Amino acid sequence: MINKAIAKIFGTQNEREIKRLMPIVAQINALEPQVKQFSDDQLRAKTDEFRAKIQERLAKYEEAEHKNHALKEVLDEILPEAFAICREAGWRVLNMRHFDVQLIGGMVLHSGRISEMKTGEGKTLVATLPVYLNALSGRGVHVVTVNDYLAKRDSEWMGKLYNFLGLSVGVIVHDLDDDQRREAYRADVTYGTNNEFGFDYLRDNMKFELSDCVQREFNFAIVDEVDSILIDEARTPLIISGASEESTDKYQRVNVIIPRLEKGEEIEGREPGDKILTGDYVVDEKHKTITVSDDGWEKVEKLLGIGNIADPENWDLKHHVEVAIKAHALYHVDVEYVVKDGEVLIVDEFTGRLMPGRRWSDGLHQAVEAKEGVKVERENQTLATITFQNYFRLYKKLAGMTGTAETEAAEFDKIYKLEVVVIPTNRTLLRKENPDVVYRTEKEKFFAVADEIAKLSVSQQPVLVGTVSIEKSERLSELLKRKNIKHVVLNAKFHEREAEYVAQAGRLGQVTIATNMAGRGTDILLGGNPEFMAKQETLKKGVAQPVHAAGGEVDARPDDPNTVYWYYAGNEYVCPRAQWEEILAHYKTQTDFEHEQVKQAGGLFILGTERHESRRIDNQLRGRAGRQGDPGASRFYLSLEDDLMRIFAKEWVSTLLQRLGMEEGVPIESKMISRRIEKAQEAVEAQNFEARKHLLEYDDVMNKQRMAVYGLRRQLLEGLDQKELIIDEYVTEILGDLLDKFAPTEKHPEDWDIAGLKGEIFTRFGVDIIAEGVEPEKLNRMQLGDGIFDKLKERYEAKEQLIGNDQMRHHERVIMLSVIDQLWKDHLLNMDHLKEGIGLRGYAQHDPLVEYKRESFDMFEGMMATFKEQTVRYLYLMQIIDAATNMPVEIPRRRAPENVRELGPVLEAENAPEPQISGGNGQQPPQRRQQTSLDDLEKQFERKKKRELEQARMAGGGMPDAVQQVVRSGDKIGRNDPCFCGSGKKYKKCHGA
């Protein structure tokens, strides 16, 4: 109440922010007359002028932190003039002038916030303002879209403006090779999808050469449809995986018994709070979980012919039974997935689009394949993974735009530190939002929807019907066919021409049935979209040709004034400008006339057939109508059998039925019911937010480890000298551990296990300390350690002298990269196993997250210790072979002889086994049974990496079910100084590892 009173007096925070930006809008408008006098060349010259000013300012500073602060200041200074230049370029090149509210939206994006702009307010054009301004720094700007079509369309469409102003533009889509990707990332402005940006990051961190990496620094990203990417897809980690060796027979074995299990329910026991499970298993649709009863497990044991399911040897089967029940009870064909060409394809629950290449993880996808009787693919092992939350946190500055962000403002702030600013519409919103209509059954609801569409068709008012699944869109389509109502069905099965169908949904008398989110990013113009109609006509007449035709590339250039380029159905076409403009003008006249007719009919009518779990998705559907001051209307038709009502408002629905005694076919229309439904949606949103936060809390643990490993890889790729690290830290730590074990300080020297110490030193380093002149019996603990360390250092430097400094650095890099990659892959698998079982700790009154943090830290420490041990062992045991005699060369303390090549015992097999070295008696270690030269070894690595990177190029995300990146600035940290991350550990044992 108090907040409302304050808002009434002082205005809301949003209104105050808009008011604060208005003087800058006035500055930009004041510059417009002057800018309009510039010639095209003078306008372009301003880009070079801005760039020079930025570089001059940055040249005054050396520290990265100071440069970043200076960059922010200078960009803010030139913002009014840069926006004025961009606005004028938009008018000259695109025939589009930025409205004042679009200038405000651009300023919000530049400041690293989310700009909420209603559908049709020109978000694509708004983005050009902050993109142009920030691209002047030369550090690159990424514009992130939800699909390849929008990335191509926007890069080509807005690219004309950027090219006119002297900026380069690149686009990242699925089928590009590394050279094409690298070129696109080097551009001033790069368009692409969230998946492509994320997978490129993971692939870069699997590369063996710095020159093979494609991305550069993460400077500034603007995320289009930011709610879809950062909220809806937040539970979908990006995963690059490779096939595991496990058999798929177990999925078939388990699948055949599931139909013989009986579904039950949870009922109240005699004592308060007691729950009794009937049947063999119970399904919780609200949380998407299943619980198997004791009777159910007994039946499973009998059906599978095994002993106690709880025995460790049966844990794997237990997991597969639970996953198979989920596949049968919670995942339905034409709802969560479709079967196409013998393959199970996931349907995106938010967009209704198919997601080829994506697979559910944890064995779920295999369980669904077994259920549907298609080929069961092998389960995958994770090679690299990251969530969108942690990927987008890599950017120094992040911004977003969407038509619906306000309902998720708290989550954007908490997770991403992004503030939402609602931008006023350029024209008054005229859309009429009618109250919900609720029917008793789903059957009654769909009959009523069909009747309503029939009525609207009489007046030829266009209708866009939103459905939640393929199955329901096809069900409604059948009803309309019976009424002879012409319509278009747009769902995941027929999405290839999605943008075209949605763009024409505003034509007179048009009826379009689509999933709630179909065609997002495509404007629905009342009367139809003349450009789409012109494209179809030019293709039909053969006027337009594909750019990459069968006979070769069409002889035309994007900057040729006599041609027009455009995308259609995923392909690029070129058309003579004169013919294009003639055909376009014809259809423009037709659609302008039809536009007025549609307005008279009431504009686009949005008819929702079910409320989504999120209010935001409902608002997005409503937002398709009433763009830019056009009339429009919306209404939702619901039933008490809808999932939202049945699962999340069950008790309220039962009470409603009893009180009102609803009769068949009689609807309820009440704002009170709409409010209750929104309350149910708020509860679901809160639950989903907790799920996303839960995922992030776990991924933050992994993120720290990932940043440490990727940081080490980057150092190695950049060719930094690792000798000091290997000798002064790795060797020192390993030697210290050996001394603690065999010559502990608490024991008298006479009780030390010198034979054991000597054997371990020989096994790990190939050095016989006795033969090298170390006399343990005459030394104290410190002298013994120093003596051994000196001999180990001498051996390393002698080997380095023999093969040369450059070659030694090269082999250090190859060995360290291959060892850390193999260990990281194994670590990811172990982390998956840990996460699977960590929830059970709750039964022992232990916080699973705390336990996960503790155990994962121990596992990571163990992995890094193994990395150091294997690195040192492989480098020390690497043998030098005389090329003439093909025999090992003794490592002398002199210059290297001529005609030597290297031979090493490192990773003779591709999966890096331990080197088989025997020690003792002062003898040189024998050669391995099969020796592998480092040249051959590197070829093995290259082949292996090629396979993994090829898998990575085709990668899809797994779908199971914030810590800021630490940036160090200032003076170099010493190895024994406290680590900058605040862990309390020494730098050499933390981020210096």
From Swiss-Prot:
<dbReference type="GO" id="GO:0005524">
    <property type="term" value="F:ATP binding"/>
</dbReference>
<dbReference type="InterPro" id="IPR020937">
    <property type="entry name" value="SecA_CS"/>
</dbReference>
<dbReference type="GO" id="GO:0046872">
    <property type="term" value="F:metal ion binding"/>
</dbReference>
<dbReference type="InterPro" id="IPR044722">
    <property type="entry name" value="SecA_SF2_C"/>
</dbReference>
<dbReference type="InterPro" id="IPR011130">
    <property type="entry name" value="SecA_preprotein_X-link_dom"/>
</dbReference>
<dbReference type="GO" id="GO:0005829">
    <property type="term" value="C:cytosol"/>
</dbReference>
<keyword id="KW-0862">Zinc</keyword>
<feature type="compositionally biased region" description="Basic and acidic residues">
    <location>
        <begin position="936"/>
        <end position="951"/>
    </location>
</feature>
<keyword id="KW-0472">Membrane</keyword>
<feature type="binding site">
    <location>
        <position position="102"/>
    </location>
    <ligand>
        <name>ATP</name>
    </ligand>
</feature>
<dbReference type="GO" id="GO:0008564">
    <property type="term" value="F:protein-exporting ATPase activity"/>
</dbReference>
<keyword id="KW-0963">Cytoplasm</keyword>
<feature type="binding site">
    <location>
        <position position="523"/>
    </location>
    <ligand>
        <name>ATP</name>
    </ligand>
</feature>
<dbReference type="Pfam" id="PF07516">
    <property type="entry name" value="SecA_SW"/>
</dbReference>
<dbReference type="GO" id="GO:0065002">
    <property type="term" value="P:intracellular protein transmembrane transport"/>
</dbReference>
<dbReference type="InterPro" id="IPR000185">
    <property type="entry name" value="SecA"/>
</dbReference>
<feature type="binding site">
    <location>
        <position position="979"/>
    </location>
    <ligand>
        <name>Zn(2+)</name>
    </ligand>
</feature>
<dbReference type="InterPro" id="IPR014001">
    <property type="entry name" value="Helicase_ATP-bd"/>
</dbReference>
<dbReference type="Pfam" id="PF02810">
    <property type="entry name" value="SEC-C"/>
</dbReference>
<dbReference type="Pfam" id="PF21090">
    <property type="entry name" value="P-loop_SecA"/>
</dbReference>
<keyword id="KW-1278">Translocase</keyword>
<dbReference type="InterPro" id="IPR036266">
    <property type="entry name" value="SecA_Wing/Scaffold_sf"/>
</dbReference>
<dbReference type="InterPro" id="IPR036670">
    <property type="entry name" value="SecA_X-link_sf"/>
</dbReference>
<protein>
    <recommendedName>
        <fullName>Protein translocase subunit SecA</fullName>
        <ecNumber>7.4.2.8</ecNumber>
    </recommendedName>
</protein>
<dbReference type="InterPro" id="IPR011116">
    <property type="entry name" value="SecA_Wing/Scaffold"/>
</dbReference>
<dbReference type="GO" id="GO:0031522">
    <property type="term" value="C:cell envelope Sec protein transport complex"/>
</dbReference>
<feature type="binding site">
    <location>
        <position position="981"/>
    </location>
    <ligand>
        <name>Zn(2+)</name>
    </ligand>
</feature>
<feature type="region of interest" description="Disordered">
    <location>
        <begin position="910"/>
        <end position="962"/>
    </location>
</feature>
<keyword id="KW-1003">Cell membrane</keyword>
<comment type="similarity">
    <text>Belongs to the SecA family.</text>
</comment>
<feature type="binding site">
    <location>
        <position position="991"/>
    </location>
    <ligand>
        <name>Zn(2+)</name>
    </ligand>
</feature>
<feature type="binding site">
    <location>
        <begin position="120"/>
        <end position="124"/>
    </location>
    <ligand>
        <name>ATP</name>
    </ligand>
</feature>
<dbReference type="InterPro" id="IPR011115">
    <property type="entry name" value="SecA_DEAD"/>
</dbReference>
<dbReference type="GO" id="GO:0005886">
    <property type="term" value="C:plasma membrane"/>
</dbReference>
<comment type="function">
    <text>Part of the Sec protein translocase complex. Interacts with the SecYEG preprotein conducting channel. Has a central role in coupling the hydrolysis of ATP to the transfer of proteins into and across the cell membrane, serving as an ATP-driven molecular motor driving the stepwise translocation of polypeptide chains across the membrane.</text>
</comment>
<keyword id="KW-0479">Metal-binding</keyword>
<keyword id="KW-0811">Translocation</keyword>
<dbReference type="InterPro" id="IPR027417">
    <property type="entry name" value="P-loop_NTPase"/>
</dbReference>
<dbReference type="Pfam" id="PF01043">
    <property type="entry name" value="SecA_PP_bind"/>
</dbReference>
<keyword id="KW-0067">ATP-binding</keyword>
<dbReference type="Pfam" id="PF07517">
    <property type="entry name" value="SecA_DEAD"/>
</dbReference>
<keyword id="KW-0997">Cell inner membrane</keyword>
